[in-house]
Amino acid sequence: MSGRINVVQGDITRIDTDVIVNAANPSLMGGGGVDGAIHRAAGPSLLAACKVVRQQQGECQPGHAVITEAGDLAAKAVIHTVGPIWRGGHDNEPQLLADAYRNSLELVTANGYNSVAFPAISTGIYGYPKAAAAQIAFETVSDYLTRRPQPKQVYFVCYDEENFLLYQRLLGQYDE
């Protein structure tokens, strides 16, 4: 496990990985936060690809993930996953958040990619408590990686200092 999980602070649209995960909304049509940043950086072809996915299968439900081209991003693909809206933790939010990470990793593996960058899913406008979300992210990704050789590298890309420090602390615990 050591060395396969990395924590960085910065702009996920500038990370050099095969795949960037987008914390999308169910419509897949872009929005605020990381979703808006990824759509702006990728250009109109990402929105066009999302429209095709939406026409084929409708909205993306919480915990689910879909893959599209990456548009103008350096990445080869974007995986759009919808995390849960925090409703106090009694509406299956932990399972849905774990599913968002796991289903994204399954798409990375199924498409033969070696590296993926995750944002802190659901911790923005969806209001998931950051520490709890970070714990679920690490547990889910670590569990996945212990049983599979792919992806070779997973990056947690934290935009803000609070998430960065939470993820750094967890990385230290998982590397021990």
From Swiss-Prot:
Its top-level enzyme class, in one word, is hydrolase
Q: Which domain of life is it from?
A: Bacteria
List the catalytic residues: D35
- Does the keyword section mention Phosphoprotein? no
Q: Which InterPro entries match?
A: Macro_dom, Macro_dom-like, O-Ac-ADP-ribose_deAcase
Q: Which Gene3D superfamilies match?
A: Leucine Aminopeptidase, subunit E, domain 1
Disulfide pairs?
none
- A single MF term (Gene Ontology): ribonuclease inhibitor activity
- Entry binding sites for substrate: D11, I12, N25, G33, V34, D35, S122, T123, G124, I125, Y126
Q: Which Pfam families match?
A: Macro (PF01661)
Which SUPFAM superfamilies has this protein been placed in?
Macro domain-like
| Keywords linked to the UniProt accession | Hydrolase
Could you tell me what reaction this enzyme catalyses? 3''-O-acetyl-ADP-D-ribose + H2O = ADP-D-ribose + acetate + H(+); 2''-O-acetyl-ADP-D-ribose + H2O = ADP-D-ribose + acetate + H(+)
Record PANTHER family: GANGLIOSIDE INDUCED DIFFERENTIATION ASSOCIATED PROTEIN 2-RELATED (PTHR11106), MACRO DOMAIN-CONTAINING PROTEIN (PTHR11106:SF27)
User: Which HAMAP family does this UniProt record tie to the protein?
Assistant: YmdB
Q: What is this protein called?
A: O-acetyl-ADP-ribose deacetylase
Q: Which organism is it from?
A: Cronobacter turicensis (strain DSM 18703 / CCUG 55852 / LMG 23827 / z3032)
Q: What taxonomic classification does the UniProt entry list for its organism?
A: Bacteria, Pseudomonadati, Pseudomonadota, Gammaproteobacteria, Enterobacterales
Gene name linked to the record = ymdB
